[in-house]
């Protein structure tokens, strides 16, 4: 199945020296406009799916950097909060969706929601209630940046070779309205110039890799025990007062 896809005109960028990236076929980084590469906290590394947490900073604009580590072109379907960043539609990370193309060992910087052939509206971290996805009453994948990488079909491969995959779903209790409002999401930010052009690309039927980054506020990550926050304080010995003397009563006359 040959489809029409978008490719960035400028795909070579320099990544920051510190932080974290995720992936083997493609490497994914989240970089804020301050130049900081968000550190990642992996929770799963089973191929073809990889998952990690990332810390979001409210109000900060960010970009998604993807580097192709393969020796052939790959198409990347990118979804933020469950919405395809090119079409804006609900994404299932399928190979029939709108995607960006990376050349062999090439790199792309994706800064926002595509609203035209030469413009995007920036990504920025905000409350879920202010997110682009919530504007469409879609909170099904809030706080998740997902990247599916599809390698280009090689001409020597047999066309009759098929691979099947079955989507599995499970029911979860919906979060409370308060918790959802306080959760992290991605907004529809300022407009910027970002030209692309259209190319033909035939993706393989199955993604070589899928990467899921769950971004949360620092307080949430602390509460979940993903990161250690504050200084470690050993428990005081109830029979050993460091002062060495009997303290005065709370009220002393």
Residue ranges and their predicted role:
Residues 1-2, 244:
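A detector of low-complexity, intrinsically disordered, Ser/Thr/Gly/Pro/Ala-rich segments
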Residues 3-13:
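Sec-dependent N-terminal signal peptides
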Residues 16-253:
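Intrinsically disordered, low-complexity segments enriched in small/polar residues
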């Amino acid at each position: 199945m040959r489809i029409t896809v978008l490719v960035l005109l400028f795909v070579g960028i320099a990544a920051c020296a510190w932080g974290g990236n995720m992936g083997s076929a493609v490497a994914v980084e989240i970089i804020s406009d301050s130049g900081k590469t968000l550190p990642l906290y992996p929770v799963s590394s089973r191929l073809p799916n990889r998952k990690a947490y990332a810390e979001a900073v409210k109000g900060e604009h960010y970009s998604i950097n993807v580097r192709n580590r393969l020796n052939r072109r790959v198409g990347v379907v990118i979804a933020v909060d469950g919405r395809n960043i090119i079409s804006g539609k609900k994404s299932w990370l399928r190979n029939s969706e709108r995607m960006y193309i990376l050349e062999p060992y090439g790199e792309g910087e994706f800064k926002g929601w595509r609203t035209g052939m030469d413009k995007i509206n920036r990504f920025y971290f905000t409350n879920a209630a202010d997110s682009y996805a919530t504007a469409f009453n879609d909170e099904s994948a809030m706080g998740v940046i997902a990247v599916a990488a599809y390698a280009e079909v090689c001409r020597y491969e047999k066309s009759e070779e098929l691979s099947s995959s079955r989507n599995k779903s499970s029911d979860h209790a919906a979060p409370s309205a308060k918790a959802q409002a306080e959760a992290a999401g991605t907004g529809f930010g300022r407009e910027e110039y970002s030209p692309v052009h259209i190319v033909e690309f035939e993706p393989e039927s199955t993604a070589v890799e899928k990467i899921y980054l769950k971004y949360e506020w620092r307080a949430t990550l602390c509460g979940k025990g993903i990161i250690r926050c504050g200084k470690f304080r050993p428990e005081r010995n109830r029979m050993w007062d460091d002062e060495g003397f009997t303290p005065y009563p709370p009220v002393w006359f």
